[in-house]
Amino acid sequence: MDKVAVVIPNYNGYRYLETCFAALAKQTFTEFTTYFVDNGSQDESCAFLREHYPETKIIQLDDNYGFSRAVNEGIRQSKEPYVILLNNDTEVFQDFVERLYEGICKRKNAFACSAKLISYQERDKIDDAGNYYNMLGWAFARGKGKPVSEFETSDRIFAACAGAAIYRREFL
């Protein structure tokens, strides 16, 4: 059995899939299985994956139930001890899975480890480097809009952005 499940929720995201899956195909760490959870898409998403990435496990829902239900279904159907949640509009570095897996394995008490997300529109800016909450209970993305060169070392955060993070199955 692989060590990591990569769960990707989707709704009519065909236009993003070539970039996302091409990057996953180049990973330095290969002990992972990809679960693609489709929320009743009307585009060519599933057909594209069947043709170009047949090793991907496709879970087709009959309607658009949203992010939470989709990722929960992917988690339920996967069995690997670690789960990466990954948005379909991401392009990951070659060591993405490896670094997240190593990061969570080094921190035995960690529930999750988050990747630093770089803005899709402004590639020199951070979109999210972990999440915090203010005194009123409002969540905010750490580092949003800062230069991509910041937040280069591991640090404790309150929560991980579920768009690119790894979780221990035992805590899910």
Where are these regions (language model features)?
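A recurrent flexible, glycine/aromatic-enriched loop bordering the glycosyltransferase active site
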Residues: 126, 138-139, 146-170
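Conserved short acidic donor-positioning loop in nucleotide-sugar-dependent glycosyltransferases
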Residues: 12, 24, 39-44, 65
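Short, acidic, metal-binding catalytic loop of nucleotide-sugar glycosyltransferases
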Residues: 22-31
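Conserved donor NDP-sugar-binding/catalytic core segment of glycosyltransferases
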Residues: 91-134
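Glycine-rich, basic loop-to-helix element that forms the pyrophosphate-binding segment
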Residues: 61-78, 88, 99
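Short beta-strand/loop segment that forms part of the nucleotide-sugar
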Residues: 31-40, 59-61
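Short aromatic/hydrophobic "clamp" motif used to bind/position activated sugar donors
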Residues: 83
